Amino acid sequence: MIVLSVGMPRAGSGWHYNLINDLMMASGAADARVIREKYKLQKILTEVNCNISVLSARRLGMVSIPALLGNTFVIKAHSSPTTASRFLTSLGLLRVTYIYRDPRDAMLSAYDYGQRALAKGRPNAFSHL
């Protein structure tokens, strides 16, 4: 089974992923970082938090292989549901958790994040706010 940890950007989704991953590992699930290495999924599950990015049929198909082989693990995304993710959810192969943050607070967090990046000379997508 794949547990998908989803959240809007700047909502604490990294913290949410780590919390869910640690809880799942404590209950016997595999560490997604180990799954990523073992099944050569580095191009699909990126970043420290095993972010799948787009929930396309191809990407979900690739990460389904370890799940179909009996592994349970957690991955992260910021994207909205797709036909492929809904299908895997209906089969019980994908379970979804979601973290929500008041959009006004998330906007302030994004603004602060962008300003800190500008101050360091490394502008990002939030720097223009």
Predicted regions and their residues:
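PAPS-dependent sulfotransferase catalytic domain
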Residues: 1-129
